[in-house]
Design a protein with these regions (language model features):
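Beta-hairpin (beta-strand-turn-beta-strand) motif
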Residues: 99-101, 146, 155-157
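C-terminal edge-of-domain segments
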Residues: 141-152
Length: 178
């Protein structure tokens, strides 16, 4: 049996039901619709299919951990407990983005540095290296603090799905002939 991953697909408000339909069509399990996002579970094939087929999602995020954190130590420990060495190579570049709403840890830049520090220490320990050059592939890490609950995500989409286009036009098209 394949590994079951939990994914979150954020979307614009009002498009949740459409996204729910798209996710069901992919064969995802345990679908939960909330304001501005749809959470679901599936294997690696569902992650790939979601990135290729979802039209109303902004991106597909892999949920790595959910835990309570009211102090920077709890934020660090929860992030350090994720097996980052299994997810990221030693030379990975991993920018951190985050948000905080109604939490005791309200300073996003401070939380970003704590999350980055936890990942760096875990990668150095897991890969048994002294430095991390961060000159390899880009892995976007995100965190969300909501009412003292932290969710850590790994972005599987790269550029936002809603910004991707199959046709790139270098010049504007003309509606009338010259």
């Amino acid at each position: 049996m394949s590994t079951l991953y939990t994914m979150v697909a954020p979307c614009f408000f009002g498009t949740e039901s459409t996204l729910n339909f798209e996710v069901k069509r992919l064969g995802a399990q345990n679908i939960q619709v909330t304001d501005g996002r749809v959470a679901f579970q599936g294997g690696a094939d569902v992650i790939a299919a979601a990135n290729l087929n979802l039209r109303t999602a902004e991106r597909v995020l892999l949920l790595l951990a959910t835990y309570k954190a009211t102090t920077f130590d709890e934020l660090f420990d929860g992030c350090y407990n994720i097996a980052w060495e299994d997810l990221l190579p030693a030379n990975a570049a991993f920018p951190i983005k985050g948000s905080s709403l109604s939490s005791q840890l309200s300073s996003v830049p401070a939380c970003q540095s704590i999350v980055k520090k936890a990942i760096v220490k875990r990668l150095m320990h897991g890969h048994k290296v002294g430095t991390l050059p961060e000159d390899g592939a880009l892995y976007k890490v995100r965190f969300a603090l909501r009412k003292d609950t932290v969710e850590i995500y790994l972005d599987t989409s790269g550029d936002g799905l809603h910004k991707l286009s199959l046709i790139h036009i270098s010049e504007p098209t003309r509606r009338t002939p010259i």
